[in-house]
C-alpha cells in the first residue's frame, strides 16, 4: 500500500462527539490522508475538523513534509445530505490524484482494520469498487438488529431491480474505489441523501466497473445505532431511487 495514494473520505453532520476520536483512530492506524466534509452541521463539528486540519499541518511542518499526510476540512454552508457530502469528498480525492478512495462513516461504527480488506482487491488489480459487507460476516449478521437485516437485504434487492449490481450490503458506508471508479462516480453521482449508496451501484453496473465485496465488522453503540438508517429512511431511499430512475433528482 505504500506506493498508493489513499484518501479516506468522511461525510460528517453534527458529529462533534465522535469526529476527533474517529480521525485520531485512523491516524493511529497510519491512515493520514483524510478528507472530512462537514455537511452544514449546527454543532462544533467543523470547529473540531479545523483543529484536526491545523494539527496535521503542524505535524507536516515539523517533519518537513508539505505534500502528504494531511487532514482536509471542507464545509458545506447548507446541508446537502450524506450523498452530497460524499460527492464533494470523491471529487476532492480525484482532484488530489488519489489512487484509491475509501468512504468511512463518522459515527465510529467502522473498524480501521477493515480498510485494508476493502483496499486489497483494488491493489491486486482484480476490482475497481469494493463494498465492505456486514452481512457477509456471519457473526455480524447474527448480531445485526432485525430491522437493519430486513432493511439492508430489501434495499439491496431493490437496488438490483433498479439496475444496480447485487451486493449483500448495499447501504454499507465502508467502500473503496479505484482511480477509474473514482472518476466515474465523481462525475456521475447525483443522489444527495442516503440513496447515494444504491445509485453508486447502479452507475457502477452501467459503466461495467468490476465490483466485489468483503466481510467487515461493525462497532454497534447506542450512538451509532441512533444515527444509522431506519425503516422510515428505508422507504425514503426507495422513493428517491424511483425518482432518480425517472430522471428526477430530489434535494
UniProtKB/Swiss-Prot annotation:
Q: Which cellular component, as a GO term, is one annotated location?
A: plasma membrane
Positions in coiled-coil regions = none
Q: What happens when the gene is disrupted?
A: Cells lacking this gene result in flagellins and S-layer proteins with significantly reduced apparent molecular masses, loss of flagellar assembly and absence of glycan attachment.
Query: Keyword annotations for this protein?
Result: Cell membrane, Glycosyltransferase, Membrane, Transferase, Transmembrane, Transmembrane helix
Pathway assigned in UniProt: Cell surface structure biogenesis; S-layer biogenesis; Protein modification; protein glycosylation
Named from the GO MF annotations, one term is: dolichyl-phosphate alpha-N-acetylglucosaminyltransferase activity
Q: Does the keyword Transmembrane apply?
A: yes
Quote the Pfam families the UniProt record gives. Answer: Glycos_transf_2
Please describe what this protein does. Involved in the assembly of an N-linked disaccharide that decorates the S-layer glycoprotein and flagellins. AglK initiates N-linked glycosylation through the formation of alpha-linked dolichyl monophosphate N-acetylglucosamine. It catalyzes the transfer of GlcNAc from the donor substrate UDP-GlcNAc to dolichyl phosphate C55 (Dol-P) to yield Dol-P-GlcNAc. AglK reaction proceeds with retention of stereochemistry. The reaction is specific for UDP-GlcNAc. AglK shows a stronger preference for short dolichol (C55-60 Dol-P) substrates compared with the longer (C85-105 Dol-P).
Q: What is this protein called?
A: UDP-N-acetylglucosamine--dolichyl-phosphate N-acetylglucosaminyltransferase
* Chain's gene name: aglK
Amino acid at each position: 500500500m505504500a506506493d498508493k495514494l489513499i484518501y479516506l473520505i468522511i461525510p460528517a453532520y453534527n458529529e462533534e462527539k465522535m469526529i476527533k476520536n474517529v480521525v485520531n483512530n485512523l491516524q493511529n492506524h497510519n491512515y493520514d490522508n483524510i478528507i472530512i466534509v462537514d455537511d452544514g452541521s449546527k454543532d462544533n463539528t467543523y470547529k473540531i475538523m479545523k483543529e484536526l486540519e491545523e494539527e496535521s499541518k503542524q505535524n507536516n511542518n515539523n517533519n518537513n513534509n508539505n505534500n502528504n499526510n494531511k487532514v482536509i476540512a471542507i464545509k458545506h454552508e447548507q446541508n446537502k445530505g450524506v450523498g452530497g457530502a460524499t460527492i464533494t469528498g470523491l471529487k476532492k480525492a480525484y482532484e488530489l490524484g488519489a489512487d484509491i478512495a475509501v468512504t468511512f462513516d463518522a459515527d465510529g461504527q467502522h473498524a480501521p482494520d477493515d480498510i485494508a480488506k476493502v483496499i486489497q482487491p483494488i491493489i491486486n488489480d482484480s476490482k475497481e469498487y469494493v463494498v465492505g459487507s456486514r452481512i457477509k460476516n456471519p457473526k455480524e449478521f447474527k448480531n445485526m438488529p432485525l430491522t437493519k437485516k430486513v432493511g439492508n437485504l430489501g434495499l439491496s434487492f431493490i437496488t438490483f431491480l433498479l439496475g444496480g449490481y447485487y451486493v449483500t450490503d448495499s447501504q454499507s458506508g465502508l467502500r473503496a474505489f479505484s482511480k477509474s471508479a473514482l472518476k466515474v462516480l465523481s462525475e456521475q453521482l447525483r443522489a444527495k441523501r442516503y440513496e447515494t449508496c444504491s445509485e453508486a451501484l447502479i452507475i457502477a453496473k452501467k459503466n461495467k466497473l468490476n465490483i466485489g465485496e468483503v466481510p467487515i465488522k461493525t462497532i454497534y453503540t447506542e450512538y451509532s445505532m441512533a444515527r444509522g438508517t431506519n425503516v422510515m429512511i428505508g422507504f425514503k431511499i426507495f422513493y428517491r431511487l424511483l425518482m432518480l430512475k425517472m430522471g428526477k433528482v430530489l434535494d
